[in-house]
């Protein structure tokens, strides 16, 4: 059995479409949330996911959009904060009531079972879609996060960074971000690489194989989508894509 795991599309349908041929090879696809906000194609991405009928987790950005709330961006420098608020306002204007209803139907967690595989999916953690599970999260904190859980594998997004780490006899997996990945450049800046990140889990008997994948796509196609969308501060949004 082959399961593709995607997360954090963030309204970048160009990135999602670049991996679609690979996703179609999987027996199942699970989306870990944050599908529409902060990108150029929020409505189009939701429409695609509605048609795809993949099970989706409720990310923190999905919950905010579904309830017409706003992020505070309190930790963001003022100039960038104003641009993000403007982008959120634009995103709200781009989606409709049906889109919000669709987002509201996302689940906080999803259990996937197949053969001997038991997989628990969430956005941030099983207990909160804003909690971060990092490569450096202490084992004792993981014990609290996964208390009462007994899955062979756990999969979450939110941090926009790929990860596989052992936790007891289980694996904790983060597929990274399809539409808004980032890494620290040599000068310390956070930059967005033009690739789509995802994970593929393959089960055979008792064995579980995890592949963290990255697929490059066209920066020109992304730029064209951003300009065509009419999103505010488009050049600012594009400046860190490399």
Give the positions of each predicted feature.
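Beta-strand-turn-beta hairpins that frame and shape the catalytic cleft
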Residues: 1-4, 111-120, 167-171, 207-209
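Catalytic metal-binding/acid-base residues of hydrolase active sites
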Residues: 10, 36, 61-62, 125-127, ...
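Core catalytic region of metal-dependent phosphoesterases/phosphodiesterases
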Residues: 2-100
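Conserved hydrophobic/aromatic beta-strand scaffold that supports enzyme active sites
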Residues: 109-111, 121, 164, 198-200
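Active-site-proximal segments of metal-dependent phosphoesterases and phosphodiesterases across multiple
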Residues: 78-82, 115-148, 183, 224
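Acidic, His/Gly-rich catalytic cores of divalent-metal-dependent hydrolytic chemistry
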Residues: 165-242
């Amino acid at each position: 059995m082959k399961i593709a795991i995607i997360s954090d599309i963030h309204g970048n349908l160009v990135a999602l479409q670049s991996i679609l041929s690979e996703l179609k090879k999987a027996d199942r696809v699970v989306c870990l949330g944050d599908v529409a906000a902060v990108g150029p194609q929020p409505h189009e991405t939701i429409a695609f996911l509605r048609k795809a009928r993949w099970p989706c987790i409720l990310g923190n950005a999905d919950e905010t959009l579904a309830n017409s709330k706003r992020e505070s961006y309190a930790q963001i420098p003022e100039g960038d904060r104003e641009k993000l608020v403007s982008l959120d306002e634009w995103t709200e204007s781009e989606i409709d009531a049906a889109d919000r209803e669709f987002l509201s139907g996302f689940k906080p967690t999803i259990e996937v079972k197949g053969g001997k595989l038991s997989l628990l999916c969430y956005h941030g953690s099983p207990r909160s879609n804003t909690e971060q599970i990092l490569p450096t999260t202490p084992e004792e904190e993981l014990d609290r996060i996964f208390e009462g859980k007994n899955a062979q594998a756990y999969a979450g997004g939110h941090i926009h960074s790929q990860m596989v780490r052992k936790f007891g006899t289980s694996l904790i997996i983060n597929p990274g971000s399809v539409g808004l990945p980032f890494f620290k450049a040599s000068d310390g800046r956070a930059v967005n690489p033009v690739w789509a990140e995802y994970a593929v889990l393959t089960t055979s008997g008792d064995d579980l194989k995890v592949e963290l994948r990255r697929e490059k796509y066209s920066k020109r196609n992304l730029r064209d989508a951003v300009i065509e969308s009419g999103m505010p501060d488009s050049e600012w949004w594009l400046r860190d894509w490399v």
